[in-house]
């Protein structure tokens, strides 16, 4: 189930399924339960494509202890796909 909660200008998106979520413009991920991401991509400040798993040398595993996961300043998350778990992107 996917739900959208509006909080501020851009709002937030709860992701708790394994569908590809694209067209995002987010800077951080709140982890609501232990999660595995198969895809986490975006752009840097110049608009160049970035794979955050590669950039951050990260296997895609998030636990509630990772709250929140932020991308470097000026970068944006634009696509996320989960293998399991639940997150809120903002």
List each model region and its residues.
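Extracellular/lumenal ectodomain signal focusing on beta-strand-rich modules
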Residues: 27-28, 39, 79
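Short, surface-exposed beta-strand/strand-loop-strand elements in extracellular ectodomains
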Residues: 35-48, 52, 86-90
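Solvent-exposed, flexible loop/coil segments flanking beta-strands in beta-rich domains
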Residues: 1-34
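Generic detector of intrinsically disordered, low-complexity, polar/charged segments
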Residues: 5-8, 20, 39-44, 57, ...
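N-terminal functional modules and adjacent low-complexity/disordered segments of proteins
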Residues: 1, 47-51, 72
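Beta-sandwich interaction modules
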Residues: 12-17, 53-78, 84-90
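Exposed regions on extracellular, virion, or secretory-pathway luminal proteins
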Residues: 20-22, 45-50, 61-63
């Amino acid at each position: 189930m996917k739900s959208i909660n509006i909080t501020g200008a851009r709002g937030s998106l709860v992701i708790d399924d394994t569908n590809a979520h694209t067209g995002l413009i987010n800077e951080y991920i709140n982890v609501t339960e232990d999660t595995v991401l198969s895809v986490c991509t975006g752009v840097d400040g110049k608009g160049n494509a970035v794979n955050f798993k590669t950039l951050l040398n990260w296997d895609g595993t998030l636990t509630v202890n990772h709250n929140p996961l932020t991308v470097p300043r000026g970068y944006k998350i634009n696509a996320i796909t989960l293998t399991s778990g639940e997150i809120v992107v903002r």
